[in-house]
């Protein structure tokens, strides 16, 4: 899977760069592995906006993903790769030898017909899942657990990864794609490989409508608002805001660290993210 550049037939296509999904499954998802997902438009139970820039978007079914890889020691064949509207990564439909099916996040390089397995006897190949203490130093992994048996949490979006840096007793050191270096229990499981859809960062939607299909509403500049709505609002005529850029709640937007200093998980982070 790569990207496709479109010809400038219309103004909205000029500069548009989209994903090439020609190799992905074009039919409906596996019926036994989907559920309904209701869009709340960023509102809570009282109807108050708690997440800005969220809209309805296109109707979608939720694909139930196996983040725990519970079928230990049972080989599974990749039936197909699919697009998932609920995440940036592609997903793979697995068919186990005992007849059960499940969806997993597809790693880069996985293709139809590949055989993968979960368990401590698995080979170091993309898609196989095993404990971190059994994975060689330097290996790229994804879908990493923070608690043994709790299911993968770290590195699940398109193109992300965690690299195993070293092993130290009951912990291992992982370097995340953000630059953060973090301690994780060695008994936690991870899946070998980098998450698929590496070209997702190169996509240019090209028009507002494509953002609305994804459920993204417009972002209004603070200087275009009234003083009651934003610290940059108001003024006579067009103004530049009159202060350093801040959020609607007055927090600096130019590199201010927002992580709490007394957070309990700080002891597991050896180096903070390059991205703040």
From Swiss-Prot:
Q: Where is this region: Disordered?
A: 224-276
Composition skew (Basic residues), residue ranges: 254-270
Q: Which UniProt keywords apply?
A: Ribonucleoprotein, Ribosomal protein, RNA-binding, rRNA-binding
Which Pfam families does this one have? Ribosomal_L2, Ribosomal_L2_C
Tell me which GO cellular component terms the UniProt record holds.
large ribosomal subunit
Please name the PROSITE patterns in this protein's record: RIBOSOMAL_L2
One annotated GO molecular function: structural constituent of ribosome
Mind telling me which InterPro entries this protein's record contains?
NA-bd_OB-fold, Rib_uL2_dom2, Ribosomal_uL2, Ribosomal_uL2_bac/org-type, Ribosomal_uL2_C, Ribosomal_uL2_CS, Ribosomal_uL2_dom3, Ribosomal_uL2_RNA-bd_dom
The processes (GO biological process) annotated in the record are:
cytoplasmic translation
What family is it from? Belongs to the universal ribosomal protein uL2 family.
Q: Provide the function of this protein.
A: One of the primary rRNA binding proteins. Required for association of the 30S and 50S subunits to form the 70S ribosome, for tRNA binding and peptide bond formation. It has been suggested to have peptidyltransferase activity; this is somewhat controversial. Makes several contacts with the 16S rRNA in the 70S ribosome.
Q: Which HAMAP family match?
A: Ribosomal_uL2_B (MF_01320_B)
According to the record's subunit comment, the protein's assembly and interactions are: Part of the 50S ribosomal subunit. Forms a bridge to the 30S subunit in the 70S ribosome.
Protein name, UniProt field: Large ribosomal subunit protein uL2
> Lineage from the top down?
Bacteria, Pseudomonadati, Pseudomonadota, Alphaproteobacteria, Rickettsiales
Which gene is this protein's source? rplB
